[in-house]
Amino acid sequence: VKFEAGKNIIHAALTILKYPSLEVVEQNGISQEITFDYISGLLTFREGAPLMSLFRRTSQNIDLIVFHSHGQSHPRKFGLASHLGVLLDVPSIGVSNKMLVGSHDHMSQQKYSEKPILLNGETVGMALRSKENKKPIYVSTGHRSDLTSAVKLTKHLVKNYRPVSYTHLRAHETES
């Protein structure tokens, strides 16, 4: 999802990949007027409509959705990845570059090092270093998923950063 500076427009993109090859099967984008003001922790109400439109337009059978957002590692333990996963009734996970809640122990700088994100003693996600000596990304379950599988899949997806790059490029193309 990308917002157009100075305009009330949101651009959303969807990339469907074949697993495990990560071959691009479909790409789609949409631009819509923003109908909900930004409220921290309620991104689904701002970003959900264009994303739902994209999912409804695809003819592909989707087995899992990876959102650039949060699932359980959210102040309400129900971030965009959880919310849209439930609405679509498709397994989902959230992967973000920003930790919203909780904390984790010090991590090794080694690629694929990981530490649980704890909130009040409960594991709500996993901090995962996707590249050596870089800041970690944060993985959490959304809907009908488990953390072990979510982390394993994310490690496979971030080998070349391709999935996020494809989708971000598509969002920028939609803006043009």
Locations of regions flagged by a protein language model:
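A contiguous pocket-lining binding segment that forms or flanks enzyme active sites
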Residues: 77-123
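Flexible, glycine/charged-enriched surface loops at secondary-structure junctions
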Residues: 160-166
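A charged, well-structured terminal subsegment
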Residues: 124-144
